[in-house]
């Protein structure tokens, strides 16, 4: 499970897709953590 500023996702891919992040890296910006 990953968490971000507006809530949580069951999958890391979902968070990255929602925030439009680069899936090749394990980060999604300051508002995203694993």
Swiss-Prot record:
Cellular compartments annotated: Secreted
Swiss-Prot/TrEMBL keywords: Disulfide bond, Ion channel impairing toxin, Knottin, Neurotoxin, Secreted, Toxin, Voltage-gated sodium channel impairing toxin
Tissue: Expressed by the venom gland.
Location, primary (coarse class): secreted
Annotated GO CC locations: extracellular region
InterPro entries reported in the protein's UniProt record: Huwentoxin-1 (IPR011696)
Paired cysteines (S-S): 2-16, 9-21, 15-28
An annotated Gene Ontology molecular function: ion channel inhibitor activity
Name of a matching Pfam family: Toxin_12
Similarity annotation: Belongs to the neurotoxin 10 (Hwtx-1) family. 54 (ProTx-1) subfamily.
Role, per record: Ion channel impairing toxin that inhibits voltage-gated sodium channels. The recombinantly expressed toxin shows a weak activity against Nav1.7/SCN9A (25% inhibition at 10 uM), and shifts the voltage dependence of channel activation to more depolarized potentials.
Domain notes: The presence of a 'disulfide through disulfide knot' structurally defines this protein as a knottin.
Name of the molecule in the record: Beta/mu-theraphotoxin-Pe1a
UniProt organism field: Phormingochilus everetti (Malaysian purple earth tiger tarantula)
